């Protein structure tokens, strides 16, 4: 690849691992440019500060290490769950929802440092390249994006290690070191596993793969109950204790994981065209989704709830495919957020051997009317004779069709 002399400074999404450490040196050599590294703490459970020393050893002068955990949950995870979002009926979008925040921060740092370009370590086969770059172009249309995995001739871990040896790149790997058989990605919402034996969709994942949860079979024999308090669609307290968004998710991850909640094994349709198998642990998100639907069940108008449900698959697709910063996602978000005004109250859930069961819900904004819903004497609150006219009017079009000879059988 020829160098581009117009690029003087590049902001790299930097983990401190093998791939992105190689990318730092490759950018320096290929573009003869200055590299700014950006490392985000979004709850991946690893120390991010060591990335500073690694970047310094590679000659990086401008190093950003940002704690984005609260922003991630407050501005991305919670808004997503207000829509009860799942992709293809199962996936809670743990990886997808983290990418818009990283893209935004890359652009902010590019603006702050006067960088000409941004770079990432996503491969040319996956969805993340699309998510990062769609976000970047939406937020800064003229930005250059450098995706080394689409350009260089380093095609394996072995060639990366050879590159490190040749260029004296300090990494915490050796050729002899045993590598995890899985490609993993983690943040406060989930941890994902791909590759290895999972590339055979018939092979069951090994038990020692799972890191956030016990197996449902080994979970406690006694259930645990949680009381979750909602305000405008977001959880603000657990068992009466007010918490920040990130603390809510951290707490639910621990409590749910201890009971084997949130494991998922799916084959999903990637935006780039292929099918991919992944395993996920999303204990906190699984609890939030179940509880949020429960509080909406008593606080939302029926037609509002049904309309939200009809829009949700498209909203989920937007997030999965990388269109968080699109006008259509923002339009839907405005409608979704507007619906959450009355979504206040408490939900009681039971965690037991991999399951989340809603066992109670209450709200001062509840539309549930016991006097009308009762099977006992409703004291005239509901006139059952009214149902006859309701049924006949709704049957009218079908009766006319039958009278005109339309055959159904």
Swiss-Prot record:
Chief localization: cytoplasm
EC number, as in UniProt: 6.3.4.5
InterPro entries: Arginosuc_syn_C, Arginosuc_syn_N, Arginosuc_synth, Arginosuc_synth_CS, Arginosuc_synth_type_1_subfam, AS_cat/multimer_dom_body, Rossmann-like_a/b/a_fold
Gene3D superfamilies noted in UniProt: Argininosuccinate synthetase, chain A, domain 2, HUPs, Single helix bin
Entry superkingdom: Bacteria
Residues that coordinate or bind L-aspartate: 123, 127-128
Catalytic activity: L-citrulline + L-aspartate + ATP = 2-(N(omega)-L-arginino)succinate + AMP + diphosphate + H(+)
Pfam families (alphabetical): Arginosuc_syn_C (PF20979), Arginosuc_synth (PF00764)
One function term, GO molecular function aspect: argininosuccinate synthase activity
Residues the record lists as binding L-citrulline: 91, 96, 127, 131, 183, 192, 268, 280
Pathways involved: Amino-acid biosynthesis; L-arginine biosynthesis; L-arginine from L-ornithine and carbamoyl phosphate: step 2/3
Subcellular localization(s) per the UniProt record: Cytoplasm
UniProt keyword annotations, A-Z: Amino-acid biosynthesis, Arginine biosynthesis, ATP-binding, Cytoplasm, Ligase, Nucleotide-binding
UniProt entry tagged with the keyword Cytoplasm: yes
Residues that coordinate or bind ATP: 13-21, 40, 121
GO CC annotation: cytoplasm
GO biological process: argininosuccinate metabolic process; L-arginine biosynthetic process; urea cycle
Family: Belongs to the argininosuccinate synthase family. Type 1 subfamily.
Quaternary structure note: Homotetramer.
PANTHER family: ARGININOSUCCINATE SYNTHASE (PTHR11587:SF2)
Protein name per UniProt: Argininosuccinate synthase
UniProt source species: Saccharophagus degradans (strain 2-40 / ATCC 43961 / DSM 17024)
